[in-house]
From Swiss-Prot:
Protein name per Swiss-Prot or TrEMBL: Pre-mRNA-splicing factor ISY1
Family the UniProt entry places it in: Belongs to the ISY1 family.
Cellular component, GO annotation: catalytic step 2 spliceosome; cytoplasm; post-mRNA release spliceosomal complex; post-spliceosomal complex; Prp19 complex
Transmembrane stretches, start-end: none
Primary location class: cytoplasm
Region annotation (Disordered) ranges: 147-177
Amino acid sequence: MSRNKEKAQSSLNRFYQSQSSAPINYHYHQRPKNIHSITQLSQAEGWRRSIIGEISKQLTEINDFEISDIKVRELNDQLNELFNEKRRWEYHIRDKLHGNDYIRHNGNTKNDLINTGIRVNNSDKGKYYRYFGRAKDLPEVKLMIEENKKNRKNHKRDDIDDSDQSKRRRKVDQYKSTDNSIDMNYYGFYDEEEDEYLDDSEAQLGDPLVVYEEKRTKELNDAEIQQQDTENLEQIRMSFNDIPTNEVVTKWLVNKRREQLLSKFR
């Protein structure tokens, strides 16, 4: 019994080995739906190549002028699905199986087959959708392409307007920050003798010229008042000099008394 069991196990092992070494038929009907079930890098690369072959075949077919518009739409939908499936395999190869980074390589080259289609914002098919071959000449697709071009121009114009507004806003902010940093000393409203700022009534920041004129007028008025006071003092001094002395007063009184006595004898 043990001998028969060993023979059976060896036969089973040989069967598994032959299955693993046998070439895989990478037909699209046999392509696994669960990408993560493939754990060997070589198999994942093979399935990716099979998708590329299918994409190339359908790109040739969608450019055929003999097929109907219905067939063109059908092929275009299939191409979008194939490109999405190809991208999923590329992520699996790079992230899970640590293989080549096809995403980065294809993103930096124009030779990728996906670049043969035009990328359009289509709300019915999803946010973005690609149209290949004759699908780009379909009436509804042409209309969407024109609308997308207009939207891109409007977005560019809005970006330019936003840029201009941001520049103006920066200038205003810069002016405000500069205006806030300028104090009263900048306009000459600082009294160095008293070591203090002048009052707001004397320092009208709105018009420095007016403030200067008011300040100068005040200085002239003060000088004129001082001059008038000096003249008044001089006049007072002169009147004090005219006051008679005691001798003069006595002489005047004697003369006055003499005149009174003489008038009595007459």
